[in-house]
Swiss-Prot record:
Alpha- repeats lie at residues 175-215, 546-577. This is Sodium/potassium/calcium exchanger 2. Residues 1-38, 155-179, 227-237, 282-502, 560-574, 629-635 are cytoplasmic. The lineage of its organism: Eukaryota, Metazoa, Chordata, Craniata, Vertebrata. Glycans are attached at N112. The modification Phosphoserine is found at S337, S341.
Amino acid sequence: MDLHQSPTARLLQKWCSHESPFGCRRHYNSRKKLKLIRVIGLVMGLVAVSTVPFSISAFTETDSQSNRGEASDMSGPRVAQGHRQRTLLDLNDKIRDYTPQPPASQEDQAENSTEHTQGDYPKDIFSLEERRKGAIILHVIGMIYMFIALAIVCDEFFVPSLTVITEKLGISDDVAGATFMAAGGSAPELFTSLIGVFIAHSNVGIGTIVGSAVFNILFVIGMCALFSREILNLTWWPLFRDVSFYIVDLLMLITFFLDNVIMWWESLLLLTAYFAYVVFMKFNVQVERWVKQMISRNNVIKVTVPEAQAKSPTAGDKDGPTLPSKPRLQRGGSSASLHNSLMRNSIFQLMIHTLDPLAEELGSYGKLKYYDTMTEEGRFREKASILHKIAKKKCQVDENERQNGAANHVEKIELPNSTSTEVEMTPSSEASEPVQNGNLSHNIEAADAPKATETAEEEDDQPLSLSWPTNTRKQATFLIVFPIVFPLWITLPDVRKPASRKFFPITFFGSITWIAVFSYLMVWWAHQVGETIGISEEIMGLTILAAGTSIPDLITSVIVARKGLGDMAVSSSVGSNIFDITVGLPLPWLLYTIIHRFSPVTVSSNGLFCAIVLLFIMLLFVILSIALCKWRMNKILGFIMFGLYFVFLVVSVLLEDKVLVCPVSI
């Protein structure tokens, strides 16, 4: 038997006879492990490959059913209809062809399924063949142009008119931020949902709102974490507050989606959840204060500045806590409650939250002579500019403190603030002493603060101007946006002008009209793009439309995060979606049921249902990721958010195209 063995086998047997049993056993175990790895890899490869024929067989079965229907009637329109069904993965088409029992409450919708498939859009000047040969580029450019138009009309006209309305009605900042200002930031999504229900007769509105929600949670937070100038510490209360409401709203939405239809009372329940959030925001400060008093580690600490201590050259306890070398622009883990509605109500995308990142440390910033005439946005930008000056001057102040010693004189300036605290600001001086406020030690040159605030007033709070810019890049941008801005400037009064302030109703209703027109064109051209390249409106809503309508939120959140306001950026990303889920979706549904004699709305889309479930799962992953990053917005958190967003897009598209089958069937 030894004669028939190969030389390699004889050499191995000889080596094992001379080596210790352990050496031979190690060699045998390594071969065994390699064999196990190969088997596992083979099984995984078979599983991955098996998904392809399963998906192909599903499409083949669908096509065979449609082909059998075509064989009975080979007329031209029937063939064209079958061709549309193969290129557009629209669930309504498939239900029309082979679903045996449509919902009884939607009989009128089933009779007009052809119109619902195409939507109530005007006839395109380009045929499908011409669009496939290159004319679709014009539709893509027009769709992007509508993204810019929606951002401009909301930014320059709609939100300022809402600010005037809240001031006229005397609504508190918290309630205004959760109602009027939330509507201003989410107007594109709301009108897209209305168009999807009444004009497109598709789920494009649901896809846009769900995709926008994931974009705000994952992509926006990821961008804020990557582009912030420093690692930002986050606090738990704003995130806990908004996530709690958002989880309840998502669970309600998932439950209502289970039977493929939305009843009128289900829409009403979602709207009721929104009003509950508004009521909570009315008492947000009191609730937060009570909750943190119940939790010993987060007790609210009130810091007061004695008059004598503030003016004393040697004021300050050397053993007491001092401010870090660079003042933080967000709340730390042990900081007190910092809610200030003026800080929150200034930027329209962030109007749902009440956060004053420096109320504990800085109190208020000084009442300027033009403070009462400024809009909420101008007040925020003014304060943000002062904060920026404080951060820039801190290092110089510390150096002057060590070299020059005591201050000659301290000037007290009182400013309006919900916390009713005071701040000491020192005028310009070569030798100055810092004012110490518990853990605060700041020295600000008085000459710089007016300059900063005047600059913020001049640049950010001025009415819209159509003057020709001097910079070449700005001139090119001006030419691009001029066809949008000029009609708005002609038809809508700018309420930021004192003389036009009384015309705020015209601006309000006119802005709504323009938003409706821009949203209609955006959805129409997105439908044409999807029809040309062969994807459904639901996928367009989940991807392109969701990102396009959320660009203003992205830009504002990144700017706020770069200023150091990490809490405001993160909590707004979660809280801004509450309006979309509890108003943007149920309001069009409720209007539809009322108009159609309380008949339910069909939302039969297995891909979108799983997308909503994925949205809920991604929200849990966001909370877990923030906790694992120790409540800090760093680069790792940013890359995690980007990875989760990519996974959501891929899985959602595969589910909507039936390449993957949702494990939860409806």
